[in-house]
Design a protein with these regions (language model features):
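Active-site cavity-forming subdomains of large catalytic enzyme subunits
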Residues: 1-142, 148-151, 161-162, 190, ...
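Active-site-adjacent bridging/hinge elements
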Residues: 10, 147-151, 175-187, 212, ...
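Inter-helical turn/loop segments and adjacent helix faces that build the functional surface
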Residues: 19-20, 81, 159-164, 187-191, ...
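Glycine-rich, acidic/polar active-site loops that bind/position phosphate-bearing ligands
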Residues: 84, 147, 153-175
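Core structural elements
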Residues: 180, 194-215
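Glycine-rich and small/hydrophobic secondary-structure elements
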Residues: 223-242
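Amphipathic alpha-helical
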Residues: 236-260
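Conserved small/polar residues in nucleotide/adenosyl-binding loops
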Residues: 271-277
């Protein structure tokens, strides 16, 4: 959001303009952080920079180091910059998103503060539901880089009648995907690196509206919130229980010490603990 060309970027899918300044078939996302929401609310300015003129700003985006560095560069009169009303920029972004669709938003600081990793999350996939650490590769066979892959499955919660039915389903999903990590082929070494050392699994659920209806709740009613909370809490508990059992059987993953789990921090702890800082 703070890139000097952001105003040109957010209109790339707009039907106005010419083929020279539009890329209408490109799908992309825009990263924001708390600082920019605060400036939107208070109707302040956002300062736009070229990443080449502000060393370290790109790497710190999404960490607790960003705000201080950003303000320092704002106050440095020797650095080229453009100031724009925060409300003007963000409302333009939302307008383009509403009119063209498929422009996604990522709250990069929140992704890091609530992730299960001590390593920094830099990016996501298009729909923003996969937030895994990555590391640049210097060439296609670079063994030191990390390309994040997410091994996915979903459980149809509309088919269950009791929360304890999730235990076997979650265990089956975890064990099945765990085997898939070692079974499948990897054409790129950096993808194999990340997947086998982190062993990240993405297990979600479908059929939520069905589940709520079976329990006498409407999808858009506030009374459904507690039911959904209880479902997701049980869902995650059983997934973590299965993962923990696998670690007892096979040993912990190679990068376990690079997770917040290694420090005893679970997702349910996020609102109660001061989290460790992410690495720069």
């Amino acid at each position: 959001i703070w890139h000097k060309e952001i105003q040109d970027i957010i209109v790339l899918k707009n039907n106005k303009g010419t083929e020279d300044n539009r890329v209408r078939k490109l799908d992309y996302s825009i990263q924001l952080s708390k600082l920019f929401y605060e400036r939107f609310i208070t109707n302040e300015k956002i300062t736009l920079f070229s990443p080449h003129d502000v060393p370290g700003l790109y790497d710190s985006f999404g960490t607790e180091f960003f705000d201080e560095l950003y303000v320092r560069y704002e106050n440095n009169e020797s650095i080229p910059k453009t100031r724009i009303d925060a409300q003007e920029l963000i409302l333009d972004l939302l307008k383009e998103r509403a009119e063209t669709g498929r422009m996604y938003l990522m709250n990069i600081d929140h992704c890091n503060s609530h992730s299960s990793f001590l390593d920094k999350v830099n990016m996501s996939n298009l729909c923003q539901e996969i937030t895994l650490p990555t590391k640049p590769i210097q060439h296609i066979d670079d063994p030191d880089g990390e390309i994040a892959l997410c091994i996915l499955s979903a459980i149809n919660v509309g088919k269950i009648n009791r929360l304890d039915e999730l235990e076997d389903l979650c265990d089956l999903s975890v064990r099945g995907l765990e085997e898939l990590i070692d079974y499948q082929g990897y054409p790129v070494k950096a993808a194999e690196n990340s997947t086998k050392k982190r062993r990240s699994l993405g297990i979600g659920f479908i059929g939520l509206a069905h589940y709520l209806a079976k329990n006498g709740e409407h999808y858009d009613d506030a009374s459904a919130w507690q039911l959904t909370h209880d479902l997701t809490e049980a869902f995650q508990y059983y997934l973590l229980k299965s993962s923990n059992q696998l670690a007892k059987e096979k040993g912990k993953c190679e990068y376990f010490e690079r997770t917040k789990y290694s420090q005893g921090i679970l997702p349910v702890s996020y609102t109660h603990l001061t989290l460790p800082t992410t690495s720069k």
